[in-house]
């Protein structure tokens, strides 16, 4: 299937939305070449989807120039640039027409595959007879400092959100789709000024048969996720190691998340079984290294995991796949979002079981499996378990169903009245007045209590003295009793 971005790319500057000042500058620049006046190459700098490449192709079409392009998915080292760009910069095309050279995303030049690329570009620019247009997302990278001194820099801003709906409406009409205006506006608002992303989103929704407002609302916010989409495009389309490994360098996502993205989109891109099998083989090896990083806390393995998931999957295919591919966020994220409430309920139940059994929630899961079997077969025992673990009616319906839950709670309800009747009886028996000893009257006391007490004390002292003498008597043989 042909990409709508390419199919409906403006053929003329008049068809390009916005960028009026930039278009005027480009027209003056190209007309200087037409009149035989050599000009400095132009570097168009701006965010992805702002129309940099489209502007270059549109002006080439308007002035009948053939285009030779090298982009981020191509190898762009010193030799390639010298052979392809160097030759084209000083000669006419095979049709006899002059050539416009487009070097796309020059800020992506890096690694061994692009070694010497920037230096060779500068060399070619100084001797170029034909017009050269370069594009870059981040023109202020240190590697491009010398390059900036050899070009005329033009900043291309993002497409205004209000300029996107007319373009989408026009494309939808030509493709025969009737789309609600709310859907078009939702797509435009999610694009974040990236017209290319908006067109891709429109094609994704249209070809997927989901043109409702709710479907459009689920589109990723390109302001935060456009980098990951660009990375997917480069990894899936390129066959060069360094280009693939550098694709995720500026992506603000964790390596595990990038792995999920690649896993989700591999079957969408790799149509040959052999390529798909090789791609997943490299991805599985990446997952092994990623697991070792987290288990052993040895982050030196991080680079191997990254290389295997990017360059490994990129080089797994025998050749590049052409045409449009609908890349999508990992479905696991959508499933996790939808099941968030369910997982929270399960988490709460496992916490209750873990608290009572003095185990972890992981082990509590094993206990829960047996409990569910009991719930389905024995209401009486189930009632005791429910009371012990303090499970609610809602939690029981989540674990079983309404019928089983109703039976168990009816057993619990049948027990409660008996317990309530016994409690008052127990309270009555417990509330008995304490026995208070009767206080004797003064007339009943002994007449001479003091004399009796003194006699008792004297007898005790005499007995104690006698025992002490027996212990000290050396003639008397000591027995065990003497030690007590």
Curated annotation (Swiss-Prot):
The keyword NADP does not apply. Heteromultimer composed of small subunits (RfcS) and large subunits (RfcL). The lineage of its organism: Archaea, Methanobacteriati, Methanobacteriota, Methanomada group, Methanococci. It comes from Methanococcus maripaludis (strain C6 / ATCC BAA-1332). Part of the RFC clamp loader complex which loads the PCNA sliding clamp onto DNA. InterPro entries: AAA+_ATPase, ATPase_AAA_core, P-loop_NTPase, Rep_factor-C_lsu, RFC_lid. This is Replication factor C large subunit. Pfam families: AAA (PF00004), RCF1-5-like_lid (PF21960). Keywords: ATP-binding, DNA replication, Nucleotide-binding. ATP binds at residues 46-53. GO terms for biological process: DNA replication. GO terms for molecular function: ATP binding; ATP hydrolysis activity; DNA clamp loader activity. Belongs to the activator 1 small subunits family. RfcL subfamily. Residues 463-478 have a biased composition (Basic and acidic residues). Residues 463-484 are annotated as: Disordered.
């Amino acid at each position: 299937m042909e990409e709508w971005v390419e199919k409906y790319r403006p053929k003329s500057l008049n068809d390009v939305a916005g960028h009026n000042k930039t278009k005027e500058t480009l027209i003056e620049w190209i007309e200087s070449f037409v009149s035989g006046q050599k000009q400095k190459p132009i570097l168009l700098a701006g965010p992805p989807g702002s129309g940099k490449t489209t502007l270059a192709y549109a002006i080439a079409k308007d002035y009948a120039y053939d285009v030779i392009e090298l982009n981020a998915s191509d190898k762009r080292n010193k030799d390639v640039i010298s052979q392809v760009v160097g030759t084209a910069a000083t000669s006419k095309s095979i049709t006899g027409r002059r050539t416009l050279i487009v070097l796309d995303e020059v800020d992506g030049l890096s690694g061994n595959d692009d070694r010497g690329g920037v230096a060779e570009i500068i060399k070619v620019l100084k001797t170029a007879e034909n017009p050269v247009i370069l594009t870059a997302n981040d023109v202020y990278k240190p590697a491009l400092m010398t390059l900036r001194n050899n070009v005329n820099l033009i900043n291309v801003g993002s497409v205004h959100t209000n300029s996107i709906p007319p373009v989408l409406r026009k494309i939808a009409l030509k493709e025969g789709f009737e789309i609600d205006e709310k859907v078009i506006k939702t797509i435009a608002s999610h694009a974040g000024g990236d017209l290319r992303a908006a067109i891709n989103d429109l094609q994704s929704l249209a070809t997927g048969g989901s043109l409702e407002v709710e479907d459009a609302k689920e589109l990723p916010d390109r302001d935060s996720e456009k980098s990951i989409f660009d990375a997917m495009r480069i990894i899936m389309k390129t066959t060069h190691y360094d280009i693939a490994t550098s694709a995720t360098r500026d992506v603000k996502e964790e390596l595990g998340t990038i792995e999920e993205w690649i896993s989700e989109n591999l079957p969408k891109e790799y149509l040959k079984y052999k390529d798909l099998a090789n791609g997943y083989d490299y991805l599985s090896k990446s997952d092994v290294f990623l697991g070792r990083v987290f288990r052993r806390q040895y982050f030196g393995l991080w680079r191997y995991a990254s290389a295997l998931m990017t360059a490994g999957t990129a080089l797994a295919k025998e050749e590049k796949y052409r045409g449009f591919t609908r890349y999508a966020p990992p479905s696991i994220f959508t499933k996790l979002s939808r099941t968030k409430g369910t997982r929270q309920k399960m988490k709460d139940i496992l916490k209750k079981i873990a608290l009572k059994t003095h185990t972890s929630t992981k082990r509590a899961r094993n206990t829960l499996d047996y409990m569910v079997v009991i719930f389905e077969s024995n209401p009486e025992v189930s009632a005791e378990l429910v009371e012990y673990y303090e499970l609610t009616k809602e939690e029981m319906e989540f674990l079983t169903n309404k019928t089983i839950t109703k039976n168990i709670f009816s057993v619990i309800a049948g027990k409660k009245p008996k317990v309530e009747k016994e409690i008052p009886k127990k309270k009555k028996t417990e509330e008995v007045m304490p026995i208070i000893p009767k206080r004797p009257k003064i007339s009943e006391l002994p007449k001479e209590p003091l004399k009796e007490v003194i006699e008792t004390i004297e007898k005790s002292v005499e007995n104690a003295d006698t025992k002490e003498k027996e212990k000290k008597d050396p003639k008397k043989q000591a027995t065990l009793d003497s030690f007590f």
